Amino acid sequence: MFPTHRPRRLRSSETLRRMVRETTLTSADFIYPLFAVPGEGVAKEVTSMPGVYQLSIDKIVEEAKEVYDLGIPSIILFGIPTDKDNDATGAWHDCGIVQKAATAVKEAVPELIVAADTCLCEYTPHGHCGYLEVGDLSGRVLNDPTLELLRKTAVSQAKAGADIIAPSGMMDGFVATIRDALDEAGFSDTPIMAYSAKYASAYYGPFRDAAESTPQFGDRRTYQMDPGNSREALKEVELDVAEGADIVMVKPALSYMDIICRIKETTDLPVAAYNVSGEYSMVKAAALNGWIDEERVVLETLTSFKRAGADLILTYHAKDAARWLA
């Protein structure tokens, strides 16, 4: 005797499948990362990230207009300065590359939400996310002195027009410090999207080519999270929420969907997932070799992040995905 319930009944046509679909992906879910460099007319493709470019500010503005026209509501800016120093001056100077890019984008596309990555690794000669002890080659960042740099960076970015401040350095207390600095400077309405559960991942390799931020010695395991930990992620989120975060993030996304799911179950705040460079480049490499259907794999992957609980997805696939979803 056949069963009374036949799940295939609701899979019999595309229209019916769409009607009962539990998770729907849209271009409004995306935040598109952009890499700003000095100069004019610069569009230099990142070798390890096909289709991703380092862009001068005039080209950033062109991209921003295209992104907005595709229905993508937000970008996040990363900067590659001309000069680097131990005080990460390029991160917090009012004439820094991210500050200039944020101002230019907001003037050209005021409706587009501009997030600013608030970190220091692109701006230091050693590639670590803050101050180091003199002579220390382990990469152990001095936490509290670094917080002062993050305060200045966040305020400078907000003054330049950034709509969202996104601290990514995984310093203890960085959300509270930045919240206090923003409030003190008159930016109490500027939200913080905290990289709350940022793992010390091997998936970041291509990004470090794009941002020119590879550590020159040591690694980042003394401040980014151990990939084997999940309870620690919940603690990090709990701390960031208590300190005033408005959005919490999991990075990377693909290997950490269990973390996205657990965090979504513990907080009412929006949860962002960062579909990182290594995840992107693996898909691009396989697609360029004809091994996979790029469109289907990308949309399936992004849908899975949302199904796991992500409200927002930072992804280099954003423009392509928006076109495919249109």
Swiss-Prot record:
It comes from the Bacteria. Mg(2+) binds at E236. GO terms for molecular function: porphobilinogen synthase activity; zinc ion binding. It catalyses: 2 5-aminolevulinate = porphobilinogen + 2 H2O + H(+). Pathway: Porphyrin-containing compound metabolism; protoporphyrin-IX biosynthesis; coproporphyrinogen-III from 5-aminolevulinate: step 1/4. Its EC number is 4.2.1.24. Zn(2+) binds at C119, C121, C129. GO terms for cellular component: cytosol. 5-aminolevulinate 2 binds at S277, Y316. 5-aminolevulinate 1 binds at R208, R220. Binds 1 zinc ion per monomer. Keywords: Heme biosynthesis, Lyase, Magnesium, Metal-binding, Porphyrin biosynthesis, Zinc. Its cofactor is Zn(2+). Belongs to the ALAD family. PANTHER family: DELTA-AMINOLEVULINIC ACID DEHYDRATASE (PTHR11458:SF0). Homooctamer. This is Delta-aminolevulinic acid dehydratase.
